[in-house]
Every structure is written in C-alpha cells, then in structure tokens.
Amino acid sequence: MEISTLQIIAIFIFSCIAGMGSVLDEFQTHRPLIACTVIGLILGDLKTGVMLGGTLELIALGWMNVGAAQSPDSALASIISAILVIVGHQSIAIGIAIALPVAAAGQVLTVFARTITVVFQHAADKAAEEARFRTIDLLHVSALGVQGLRVAIPALVVSLFVSADMVSSMLSAIPEFVTRGLQIAGGFIVVVGYAMVLRMMGVKYLMPFFFLGFLAGGYLDFSLLAFGGVGVIIALIYIQLNPQWRKAEPAASTAPSAPALDQLDD
C-alpha cells in the first residue's frame, strides 16, 4: 500500500492535533482509541484502526503523568503503530509490539519538548512585565506548536518513507523472542492498567467482579458482545440487591383495633 500526498498531509495535520491534545487533555485526541481510528480512516482501513486503537487503549489505561515523571507517549505510539500496521498489512499483535518501544521513545521526546518550552515561558514572563499581551499569546501558541511537532515530525517521516516491503523487512530483522515478549508484556500491561484504575478509584468491593471477568474470559468461549451483555445484567442485579442503592421502604402504620382500645381502658 502506498500513501498518497493527500493522506500524508492529513496524517501530519492530525498528528499535530494529537500532539497538542496530549498537553491540553480537552478533546482526548491523543488517546489510542481516537488516534488509531482517525489514522485508519485516513488510510482507508477503519476496521484495523478501531481494533488496534481499542487494544492499545486497554494497555494505556494506567499511563499517566505523576508529578514531573512523564508517562509513555500514547499519541506517538498510536499513530506510528497504526501507520505501520495498516500499510504493512500486519496483525494487531505486531502493532502492540511496535507501539510499546515507540511509546518509550516518545516519552524521551516529550521530556525534550517540555524542556524547550521552558524558554518560551521565560520569554512570556518577560513580555508580561512589559505588558505585551499579543507577544504572550504568540509565545503560548508557539510552545503548544512544539508539542504538536513532537508527534507530527516522526509521523511525517514514517509516512514519507514507509512501505509494505520495508515494514516486513524491519519486522523480520527483529528476533522473534523480542516481538513475542513484547506481545506478552502488552497483555500483562492491560491487567496492570485495569488494576491501577480500580485502585485509584478506591472500589475494593468491585475486585471480585474484576477477577471474575478474567476467569470467565479465559474459560468461556463468549464473544465480546456476550460478555458485555452478561456484565450489564450482573451490574443491574448488583444494584438491585445492594442495600446502598435500595430505597428505604416506609414503615406501615396501622391503627389499633377497637377491642384493643377497650382492653387498654380497662
């Protein structure tokens, strides 16, 4: 599959938006589910984009910045892996093996880009002292543009030079135990991501359902739609039986009968 010039331009524009979205966190364009889906739509393979994005989204559930520590770059990993998988006609498992090291490399690029933006912030402080508000706006937009180019430039390079033969040759050069290990690690990261989210939410009472889901997934030959339906049914039953969600029934008050009143009078 060859990428056309129009597709390359569209990938570059969306990569800029995804890179800026990883800082703004408003429209979540940097999340794998959105990024891979849009790349799949641009390259004409929406199904593969959605499948890869959904798989990577599960892996990236636990990726979050903690203080000055930067998380792996989900935007760069999603876009690069989606391009290589769709153009090279590779499997979703290969996409996971590609995304993990790319996310680690993007983490380094993120730190480098944030270091560069410090220069813009100092310049904005100086402009604020001189009441040059248009300069402040320009510096803020320029700093945001650095974050966009952080993802767009690697995506542009890959889009310009990638081909199906190149992807196959590159993957053939990687030892099988490396790609297999990355695929297994990707499966473990999904579990760890779910566990981190549940622990952060502080809902220990949901842990039995967490383990029940993985046991059912391992031993029952159900489709995802069937698992979703079973999950909804269990959730509804749980809400109906849990005293926390049940409305308190008003106590019935009955007036004493006439004979009872007569006995009290006696």
Curated annotation (Swiss-Prot):
Segments traversing the membrane: 3-23, 33-53, 79-99, 100-120, 151-171, 183-203, 219-239
Induction of the gene: By L-sorbose.
InterPro entries: GatZ_KbaZ_carbometab (IPR050303), PTS_IIC_man (IPR004700)
GO biological process, one term: phosphoenolpyruvate-dependent sugar phosphotransferase system
Covalent S-S links between cysteines: none
Cellular compartment(s): Cell inner membrane
Domain notes: The EIIC type-4 domain forms the PTS system translocation channel and contains the specific substrate-binding site.
Protein name as it appears in the record: PTS system sorbose-specific EIIC component
Organism field: Klebsiella pneumoniae
